Each structure stands twice: as structure tokens, then as C-alpha cells.
């Protein structure tokens, strides 16, 4: 693949979910509606949006967990929906809904993942403590069962697991949700290091505007499944004649992050 070719190429990607209401009627909601964008190797792109905007659906589609209803997506030249096994070897995903063996410890979960990725015992024994330390996971709790850890602690283990193989494309779905300020800063620092040391391409889906502005080269805004823009933050501010991303969100959507959501928004959140 040419170095000038996109790392991620999404064209008119759509996903519609149905939800039964009553005995017969099904309500259909578009979690994504004709979304298109590209990413270059080594780039970090942040997708902003409220809950239910379609961010998680986008991540699930690119990580081969869902099939699209329309459109195409390619990761380093491979068709996400026709060549899922090739794509899976290039992608690691961190999500707020990360699953673990709850009775096993953080170290045991990572060791299991390492074996799955084909890492040998010596490399596993060396790498796991280093990664856990880098994401700010305390050494005193590495042997503790996952079910006894807070959501924030589990999120750190999810990030560590995704970084075991130095992924080419890292899909981060709210990676710092549930973390205290210090842990959040540690994870953000580690994301920067991974990007620059391993030339990883990063898609960061978040509702944290400050996080997006600090970490990303370009910022996109998903609202009710529509990608309203995706461009450098200064271009976004200039486009709308504003000084902050929050003002840009208001200018683009006519509402603020704090506005009450409609029934349609709440129903869309079930899917997106």
C-alpha cells in the first residue's frame, strides 16, 4: 500500500437499528447516516458527540463488530466488511464496555490476551508490568480480581490490553471515561507516546472537548448520526467565528452539550 494512501477511508457509511415497540411496530433509527472521512497514517482524529450521536457505532463498524447497511470502509487498503480477519490484525479497540474474565486478575487477563496474540511467556512476563505501570495501574492491585476493581481501573486494563501489540490503528471509544484527573492525564500522556513511538493511527471518540483539542490533529462532530465537519480545530473555530469548541458545537447544531435531549435522542442512545 502506498504511504500516501489513506490509513482509514470511510465512504457513505450508514447503520440503521430497529427497536420493537408493541407487538408489531418497529421503530428504525439511523445510528450513522452517510458518514464519509479519511485518515492518514500517524494521524489522530477525534470525533466529538453526545451520547447517542453514533460514535460507538462507528468504532464497532471499523473494528468489524458490526456490518454496515450501506457504504464502505477500508483500513490500510483492506475492506473492513469483506476482509475482517486482515483488519482485525491491524486494529485494537478500547471501549467503556470492555469485557474481561471477571474472576481473573488484571495481570491474568493481559496474559491471556498476550497468548491470544501469539506472544511468548518471556515477552509476556516482561511487557505486562511495564504497560500497566505506564497507564497508571498500581502494582499492589495487579493480582486482584477484575470484579473488585472500579470502572476506572478496568478502563486502564482495557487500554493496556489494546496496547500489548502496538496496534497500527487504535480505536478509542471514551478511553478516559470514569478515570480520576490524575489517571486521565496519565492515559492521555501514554496515548501521545504510543502515537509518536509506534506511528500508530488513532481514532478517538469522546465527549470531552478539551481532551479532543489536546490530542487530535483534526476534530469531527457527530450529531444524531450525521458528521457535520472534520477539520483542524482552528479551522473549526474560524468556520463558525467562535473561540471555543463548545461554541462551535452550538453554532453547528443550535444547542449546547447541556441541552435536554429529546425522546428521539434517548432512543438513539440505545443503539449508538
Describe each model-derived feature in a short phrase.
Residues 170-173:
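Catalytic Walker B motif of ABC-type/P-loop ATPase nucleotide-binding domains
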Residues 166:
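Conserved catalytic motifs of ABC-family nucleotide-binding domains
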Residues 111, 115, 122-141:
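Conserved ABC ATPase "signature" region
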Residues 185-197:
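Helical segment within the ABC ATPase nucleotide-binding domain
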Residues 145-149:
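Conserved ABC ATPase signature
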Amino acid at each position: 500500500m502506498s504511504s500516501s494512501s489513506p490509513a482509514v477511508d470511510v465512504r457513505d457509511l450508514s447503520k440503521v437499528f430497529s427497536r420493537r415497540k408493541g407487538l408489531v411496530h418497529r421503530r428504525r433509527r439511523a445510528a450513522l447516516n452517510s458518514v464519509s472521512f479519511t485518515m492518514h497514517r500517524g494521524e489522530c482524529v477525534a470525533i466529538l458527540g453526545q451520547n447517542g450521536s453514533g460514535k460507538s457505532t462507528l468504532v464497532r463498524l471499523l473494528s468489524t463488530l458490526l456490518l454496515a447497511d450501506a457504504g464502505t470502509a477500508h483500513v490500510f487498503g483492506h475492506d473492513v466488511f469483506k476482509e475482517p480477519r486482515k483488519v482485525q490484525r491491524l486494529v485494537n479497540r478500547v471501549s467503556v464496555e470492555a469485557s474481561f474474565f471477571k474472576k481473573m486478575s488484571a495481570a491474568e487477563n493481559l496474559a491471556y490476551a498476550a497468548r491470544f496474540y501469539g506472544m511468548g511467556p518471556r515477552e509476556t512476563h516482561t511487557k505486562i508490568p511495564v504497560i500497566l505501570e505506564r497507564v497508571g495501574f498500581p502494582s499492589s492491585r495487579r493480582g486482584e480480581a477484575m470484579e473488585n476493581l472500579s470502572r476506572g481501573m478496568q478502563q486502564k486494563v482495557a487500554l493496556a490490553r489494546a496496547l500489548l501489540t502496538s496496534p497500527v490503528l487504535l480505536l478509542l471509544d471514551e478511553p478516559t471515561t470514569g478515570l480520576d484527573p490524575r489517571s486521565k492525564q496519565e492515559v492521555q500522556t501514554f496515548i501521545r507516546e504510543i502515537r509518536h513511538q509506534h506511528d500508530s493511527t488513532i481514532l478517538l471518540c469522546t465527549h470531552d472537548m478539551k481532551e479532543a483539542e489536546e490530542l487530535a490533529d483534526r476534530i469531527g462532530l457527530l450529531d444524531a448520526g450525521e458528521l457535520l465537519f472534520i477539520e483542524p480545530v482552528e479551522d473549526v473555530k474560524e468556520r463558525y467565528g467562535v473561540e471555543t469548541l463548545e461554541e462551535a458545537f452550538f453554532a453547528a447544531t443550535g444547542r449546547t452539550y447541556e441541552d435536554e435531549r429529546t425522546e428521539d435522542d434517548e432512543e438513539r442512545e440505545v443503539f449508538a
